[in-house]
C-alpha cells in the first residue's frame, strides 16, 4: 500500500480548511485516511502560529514507515525542520530561445551598421 501524507479539504465554500492526513494514495482526496497528523488553515495570517499545526512525532513515524509527503505538505515539513526539500534550480529555463537570440543579434548588427554609416557620412561631410 503506497502511503501519502497529504491535504484533505474541509470547511465551507470559499473558506477552505485542510487536515494533513496519512492516506492510501489510491483513496479519494477527502476520503478514508489512516491518521490525522496536522492541519492547515490558509485563511489565517502567514505569521499566525495556528496556521499550520503539525504532530511532529506522528509525522516522523509515518515517514519512517515509508509515507511520502506531497509537495505542499513537504513545504510545511521543511519549514518546521521535519524534512528536507530539494532546492529547485533550472538555469536553462531562464535562457532566451534560439529565435530570440537571433533577433537580438540581428538588432545589434543593424545598430552597428547604422553607427558605421553615420560615422562615414560625418567624415565625408568634413
UniProtKB/Swiss-Prot annotation:
**Superkingdom per UniProt:** Bacteria
Q: GO molecular function terms here?
A: structural constituent of ribosome
Region Disordered: list its residue ranges: 87-126
UniProt feature, compositional bias: Basic and acidic residues: 99-113
Its cellular-component GO annotations read: cytoplasm; small ribosomal subunit
Asked if the keyword Cell cycle belongs to this entry, the reply reads: no
* GO biological process assignments: translation
| Low complexity compositional bias, start-end | 114-126
Give a yes or no for keyword Repressor in this entry.
no
Q: Which Pfam families match?
A: Ribosomal_S16
InterPro entries listed in its UniProt record: Ribosomal_bS16, Ribosomal_bS16_dom_sf
List keywords of the entry alphabetically: Ribonucleoprotein, Ribosomal protein
Family statement drawn from the similarity comment of this UniProt entry: Belongs to the bacterial ribosomal protein bS16 family.
Which HAMAP family does the UniProt entry name for this protein? Answer: Ribosomal_bS16 (MF_00385)
Q: Write down what this protein is called.
A: Small ribosomal subunit protein bS16
Question: Which organism does this record belong to?
Answer: Agrobacterium fabrum (strain C58 / ATCC 33970) (Agrobacterium tumefaciens (strain C58))
Gene name as annotated: rpsP
Amino acid at each position: 500500500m503506497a502511503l501519502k501524507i497529504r491535504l484533505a479539504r474541509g470547511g465551507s465554500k470559499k473558506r477552505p480548511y485542510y487536515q494533513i492526513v496519512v492516506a492510501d494514495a489510491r483513496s479519494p482526496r477527502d476520503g478514508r485516511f489512516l491518521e490525522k497528523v496536522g492541519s492547515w488553515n490558509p485563511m489565517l495570517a502567514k505569521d499566525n502560529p495556528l496556521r499550520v499545526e503539525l504532530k511532529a512525532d506522528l509525522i516522523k513515524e509515518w515517514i519512517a514507515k515509508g509515507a511520502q509527503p506531497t509537495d505542499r505538505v513537504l513545504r510545511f515539513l521543511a519549514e518546521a525542520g521535519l524534512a528536507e526539500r530539494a532546492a529547485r534550480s533550472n538555469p536553462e529555463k531562464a535562457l532566451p530561445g534560439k529565435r530570440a537570440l537571433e533577433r537580438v543579434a540581428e538588432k545589434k548588427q543593424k545598430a552597428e551598421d547604422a553607427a558605421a554609416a553615420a560615422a562615414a557620412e560625418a567624415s565625408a561631410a568634413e
